[in-house]
């Protein structure tokens, strides 16, 4: 399994709206993507900084995450809440408890 780790930020005042967009638009779009196995979103409510970890069957699935048209359309909603992406990385899961 592979994890795609994405750093992000939005204004702390927009946290509730950012979470709503993630739950109602992003997660359903991810669920339609080939190889998708899960999504975890971690946020510091005081700063609006966070990390999204999406889980994928193969490295190739993780590599094309976000290129799917439904997912790209859902992600287009984030700029309205001041959302910006930072660095993105893909890692292989080697130990899980």
Located regions from the model:
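A common structural junction motif
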Residues: 72-76
